[in-house]
Each structure stands twice: as C-alpha cells, then as structure tokens.
Amino acid sequence: MATAASGPCAGGSPRDILWRVLGWRIVTSVVWSVLLLPVCITAFIVFSSIDLFHPIQWLSDSLNEFYSSQVIFYLLLLAVVIIIISIFNVEFYTVVPSIPGSRLALIARILHPQQLTHSFIHAVMGMAVAWCAAIMTKGQSRSLVVPCTGTESLDSPAAQTCMNEYHLFFLLSGAFMGYSYSLLYFINNMNYLPFPIIQQYKFLRFRRSLLLLVKHSCVESLFMVRNFCIVYYFFGHIPKAWISTALDLRTDEQAHRPLDTIGGLLNVSLLYHVWLCGVFLLMTWYISWILFKIYATEAYMFPVQPPFAEESDECLPKVLNSNPPLIIKYLALQDLMLLSQYSPSRRQEVFSLSQPGGHPHNWTAISRECLSLLNDMTQKLVLYQEAAATNGRMYSSYSVEPKRLSSPEETAFQTPKPSQMPSVPPLVKTSLFSPKLSTPDGSSPFGTPFGSSVVNRMAGIFDVNTCCGSPQSPQLVRRGPRLWTHTSDQQVSAVSNPSPCASVTAEGKTVRQPSVLYSWIQNKREQIKNFLSKRVLIMYFFSKHPEASIQAVFSDAQMHIWALEGLSHLVAASFTEDRFGVVQTTLPAILNTLLTLQEAVDKYFKLPHASSKPPRTSGSLVDTSYKTLRFAFRASLKTAIYRITTTFGEHLNAVQASAEHQKRLQQFLEFKE
C-alpha cells in the first residue's frame, strides 16, 4: 500500500495546512508533466514527417530536428503552457461534483465569469500550442505571411506578400480545441477528483491510464477537427478578412483553394496535421491533469496524537473536527478508513486515554465527527423525501407574525457543527421515527412527524389554499404521512378533512385568508406557468432531470462512506483491542444512528428513479463514479452494520435502543436483512 509519510503536527491557518499537505504534490505533478513534454514533442515530430518508404532517413531527420535550437525554444514555450494549464487544474479542482439539475443550469454554469476566464485562457494556450506545432511540421503552414505567386503581385512592394491561410487554419483550430477542452472540462466534471478505492503506487496508476489517454486523445481530436471544419466552413471568411485587412495582406487564391469551401477542406495532409496537433495538445494537457489527480488523491497519514499539545492543528482528531479545506477533510477521512483497517498501532492511539485526566479525547473527537456526518446524511434524506412528498411544489402563506428563527424544530434540523455536538443521544430514532412524535396538528397539514418548520424551510411557507380545500391539496395531504410513520385511523381522518379556512401555526398564531390581489397574482402565475410548460423549446431548457437531483443528494457521499467504514472498523476492532472500554460509552448512539440512517436509506430508495442505475461507461478517461455513489453508500451502510453485529453477536441485546431498533438489530443478527 502506497501512503505518503506525514510531517509533524504543526499549527497554522487552513491555507497553511493545505499547502503543507498538497504543496509538494502539486509541484511534483507539474515537474513530471514538464519532464514528459520532450517525449510528446519527439513523438509529434516523428509522426508529422512520416515517410514509410525511407524509414532510416525519416527517423534520422526527426532526431536532428528535435535537437535543433528552434525546437528547444518551442519546448520552453510549451513548458510555460503546461505550467499555466496545471495552475488552472489546481485552482478549479473539487472533491464534490457539480451536478446541474437542468440544461439551463448547465448553460449558466458554463457562462459563469470564472468559467469564461478558464475558456479564454485555454483558447489562448491552444493557439500557442498550434503555433508551435505548425512550425514544427515543416509544411505549408510554417508562417502566416508568404510571398504571392501571381505576377500581378509584383506591382508594388506592399503587394508582394500574401496571407497563408493554412497557418491561420492551424491557429484557429488550436484556439477551437483549447476552448472545446475547457467546455468539456466543466460539462464532464473533469475538475472532480475521484479518490481511488484501492490504493496503488503512483506509477501503476499512471501506467494504467496511459493507453486510455492516448486512445481518448485520438478520438476526441478527430471529433474536434470535424466540428472545427464545420465552423470554419460557415464562419472562416470572417477572421480571414479581418486579418487580411489589419495586416494589409492579400489572399492568394492561385496557390490553393480557399479553406472555407468544401474543396479546400478536402485536403488530407492539412487535416492529418491538424488532427495530429490536436492529439499532441490533448495528450500534454491530459497528462498534466492525470498526474495532478494521482498526486492529489494519494493517501496522507495524519498523526493521531501530537507530540506537543500546542502542535495539534494537523492531527487527525483536530482536522476532522475543524473546518479545513474540503480536500483535507476527505484525506483525513480516507486516512481514518485506512488506519481502522490496517494499522493496529494507530488504532491503539485512538482508543488511548489522555494523561493526566484519563479522558478518551481522540475517540470522542473522531466518533463525534463521524456521527455528525451520518446525522447530516439522515437529515438530508429526510428533507429530500419531504420535498418529494409534495412533488417539489413551493407554497407560500400569510401569517400574522413573521416566523421565529430559533424554534426548537428548526434547531433540531439545522446542520450540527462539530463544536455544538459534544455527544449524540442514544435514542436518535425517537426524534425522527417515533410514532409518539408523529401526531399531526393544525400547523402540519401534511401530517409529518417533523412539524411544519422543516417543510417550510424546504419549500417556503405553506399556501393557505392547501388548507382551504383547493383541488390539489387533498392529494398532497394524503401523500405526506406515508413517508415516515403509520398513522392511526384518527390521524388519517384528521388529515383527510382539514378545517376549511382557519388553521393554527406552530407558534399558535392564526392564518388569515389571502387578499384578492394575491389570489389574482397566484392565478396569473399559474396560467403563465401552464402556458410555458406547453412550449417544447422552453421545457427543453427548464425541465429538471430526476436523475440529476438524485445524484446531487449523494454528491458528497464519499466522505460518508469513509466515515461509515472507519467507524464500523474501529467499533469492531474495539471488541478485542479496546482495553479501557471507551467505545462502549458511545456504542448505543452509534447503533441507533446507523439503524436510523438505514431506515432513511430504505425509504429513500423506494422513491421513483432512486433505484434506477445510470448506464455504465467503461473504458472512459472521464470518471463517472459519482453517478452511482448512492448504491455504494447503501452497500457500505449495510456492510458496516453487519460488521458490528457479527463481531459483537448476542452482546448487542444489552445495548439500550428503541423497540423498533431492537427488532431491526435482531434481523441483522439473524442475517435476514
């Protein structure tokens, strides 16, 4: 297993920690990208001057060309391009993929000022690469200005030079390929850093990706050349006329056909060299991108205990419970998962007690953060299902007084911060799924066990029409309680027959009827919405894909998977390694949290489209594993519970838990889940 050695625990700001962890990795990836550049240039020179009938002369000329001073200058220029591309890789990376819910959201993302800057810089860098490639090909495209071939060009000195359209075609194709690379970079989430499931040496990971990189570059360059030829056929006359006018150059149509015609574009030699230039550009940029991903996602070993108390900012418990950059949080959780499985000595540090005092600070900090992450996922699934119960509709109402910001219901469902969660209550189930708390009142027309404040936070404030007998309210009301709890007959009758117009909010305030103006505005808004929904083009951009919203719920599930695996392995190892019994104090909370999350996941996968698997894209250079993270999370959750139950066995019957959780736990003990 390849893991990086850790440095000492040192204090500092989050940016200092980020630089200490990732700084040398970024520099090393850039250095290797530059060192591999001569290999790519040599391959480009060899294939650009291919001559199968004279192979000895072909290879000797290629080697002589590589050692020329001109190529060395281009090597330095291309090294600068690689460094700039690497800087943009570092600036735009993310560990949580961005999943747009509609085509309009994707367009808005592409047109963001940062993305536009990214595209512009890559277009300029692509033009620089194409300029170097055009000169190294030794063909008709070496220079933008060439002598005219016609006799009429000798009338005046200014008319003796003409524009070389081949060179212009090369430059514009490089800019187009650079922009296309940037466009696909965000559309395909290439800035997403997927962490490897199996830890391997960096060389093995790069060697495994090399053949796929070459294949992907060749195919993608072919499509880019096709698209550029189409664009140049329709709009190529615009830059050609502008450059001819700006530089006072003539267009020599006697030397070759214009390239913005079908006959001019059917130049096999030109298309081959442009395609080869695209392969060279994509390979050098993809190498830089792959090396950065390999180095950035390599496992990092955080020390569990600092040598001194004042030097604990980079230690595992402190990093997990602080707010570092997200990639540092991911690396810390990955390290927790690895130490829980493969490092008995570091597990002993987790189970150790502080001296003096005898407190399990390491275990408390680690378990608290893991339980906080799992509770966050439970709340996210709860809120998503509450939104799905109302079909994602937004409601609004008028209340006499504004809603309070610190109600107990809202406080219970806010994302807990690590500093605000000293411990997790042993019966998490009762706060979410207990039937005693699920009695609907007048403030909760949907009859959910969470009160109206949770739904209000998700979907705005409720519309009074849902309580006043609107045509759609009975369907929405009936669907609400079915998500979480089995309601009694009295509850069903109370929900099915809400009071006509008067209701009471959670704060005990009455809700008044909307004004005539408000009703008229609501009706007009519905009419406009219905009118636009019948237009195919508008719905093409505004319609939301259900798979995207489902993927967005689990977009950051990788760290929850590591929290599950790390916590469950530590609990299982504590059965024989925990000499002080520090895990036993939090075992009820851990089991109840896992079982609560298991029930939420089971109910989530009963929703439409949740169980549908997207098509697999095997053999692709772009990682799409984030699309199936929900299935990996469900499998990891069930495996984590089984790991604990098979280790402790019947001893778990003595753990304090609710009746439903005891029943669910017994099913795991009997391997019936």
From Swiss-Prot:
Residues 408-422 have a biased composition (Polar residues). GO terms for biological process: homologous chromosome pairing at meiosis; mRNA transport; nuclear pore complex assembly; nuclear pore localization; nuclear pore organization; protein transport; spermatogenesis. The chain crosses the membrane at residues 26-46, 72-92, 116-136, 167-187, 227-247, 274-294. InterPro entries: Nucleoporin_prot_Ndc1/Nup. Residues 406-425 are annotated as: Disordered. One of its GO terms (cellular component) is nuclear envelope. Phosphorylated. Disulfide bonds: none annotated. GO terms for molecular function: protein-macromolecule adaptor activity; structural constituent of nuclear pore. Residues 1-25, 93-115, 188-226, 295-673 are cytoplasmic. Its main location: nucleus. The modification Phosphothreonine is found at residues 415, 439, 448. It is a multi-pass membrane protein. It is found in: Nucleus, Nuclear pore complex; Nucleus membrane. Interacts with the NUP35/NUP53. Belongs to the NDC1 family. This is Nucleoporin NDC1. It comes from Rattus norvegicus.
